[in-house]
Amino acid sequence: MGMFSELLFQLLFLFQSAIGGSMITTDKVFADPRVAQLANAAQAGDLTRIETLIKAGTPVKFVGQEGMTVTHYALRARRNAPQVIELLLKAGADPVSMLSDGNNVPHYAVSRDNADPEVVKVLMTHGIGPNWFPPKGVYNDLSMLQAAVMGHNLPVIKLLVERGADLNYVDPFSGSALHYALNGTDFYMAAYLVEAGINLKLLDSTSPEIKNPRTVRRTAIEKFCYFDGGKRGDDPLPEAADGWRVFTAALAKRGVTMPCGL
């Protein structure tokens, strides 16, 4: 249960510490004070100030500490987030903005708390498709759909699927989007993936790098039942119980009975 949570924490930590709190201010991130001002304006959602700074020649592609760019700050805009992103990307800002540890803007955009589908739509108009992958780094096997599932962002999940995300992509270690969706208590995501037609027979641990002969490859349902099935007791959280009913009903429509309980 903890593996995906830890991965998501790692994915978000540098963003949160650099742009979500008071520990690191923009003048410490960007050596160019103009860029620091632009980052502040982006985070504030001040469209007029952003336009003024861009027209004044502020370098929107400037890379700061750990690979930070103004695009990262735009994702944290307190208002007007889609418009902020659009202004910056139209001016030439980097929609990918890889950090030094491999984290990136597209994954953060779909996995952050309360991710905004409208922001994701803007990224899509600037080259970030529903099946985009990082060009390198430790997260280059993580799909956009899987990242959205990790963030528990059902509206974004639906958007990605509607735009053509590969439901049946398999991470060579962690498995399918359904593996991710069943790693927690939000079964509404799993229900949606089942209703959308995800292949229920996809396995995890398929990477040739896994040399342990004892490794057991499991479907998402098999893995859930092995590690978590029946362990939530007779009185689960109401939202978990309701999501479970929706999930098992979605399976039933496909002629599948869940082999274990909640």
Where are these regions (language model features)?
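Classical Sec-dependent N-terminal signal peptides that target proteins to the secretory pathway
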Residues: 2-20
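N-terminal segments that cap or nucleate solenoid repeat domains
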Residues: 23-67
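Ankyrin repeat domain, specifically the short helix-to-loop turn at the C-terminus of the second helix
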Residues: 51-59, 86-94, 121-130, 158-166, ...
